């Protein structure tokens, strides 16, 4: 579980970094509200928003799955989520070539896998 908490904390820090990036870009480009139609501003906003859209649900599902699966599965899923979200952010901001595709694909596959794992685990629970 320690790996899960470290990854969750690092994802939280990534949210902070992307938030600061949007704020600084707003000041630099003099865009107070919205995206001003600026492609770089749009990418910064979407990198931040996409992390907020996916990370909390994925973290919750991984945490729930930790009741059914061991340390290594939970740790592996946590690290994959962190790497996928970092790749996506880097790709959106033009730092990591193919990062957007790899990050989005990795996140979507992880979300599907953990969801299926929980459904299967739920059906295998004993009735009390």
Predicted regions and their residues:
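Residue-level signature of the transmembrane alpha-helical core
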Residues: 9, 79-82, 105, 109
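Mid-chain, well-packed structural core segment of small domains
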Residues: 58, 65-94
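Cytosolic, membrane-interface loops and tails of multi-pass inner-membrane proteins
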Residues: 20-46
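Alpha-helical transmembrane segments
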Residues: 3-18
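Juxtamembrane loop-transmembrane helix junctions in multi-pass integral membrane proteins
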Residues: 2, 40, 44-47, 65, ...
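Core segments of transmembrane alpha-helices
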Residues: 50-62, 111
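Juxtamembrane boundary at the C-terminal end of a transmembrane helix
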Residues: 116-128
């Amino acid at each position: 579980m320690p790996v899960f908490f470290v990854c969750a904390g690092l994802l939280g820090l990534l949210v902070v970094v992307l938030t600061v990036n949007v704020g600084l870009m707003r000041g630099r480009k003099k865009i107070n509200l919205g995206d001003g139609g600026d492609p770089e501003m749009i990418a910064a906003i979407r990198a931040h928003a996409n992390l907020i859209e996916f990370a909390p649900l994925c973290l919750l599902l991984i945490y729930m799955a930790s009741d059914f699966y061991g340390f290594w599965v939970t740790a592996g899923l946590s690290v994959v989520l962190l790497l996928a979200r970092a790749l996506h952010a880097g790709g959106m901001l033009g730092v990591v070539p193919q990062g957007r595709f790899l990050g989005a694909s990795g996140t979507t596959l992880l979300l599907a896998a953990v969801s299926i794992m929980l459904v299967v685990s739920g059906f295998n629970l004993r009735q009390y």
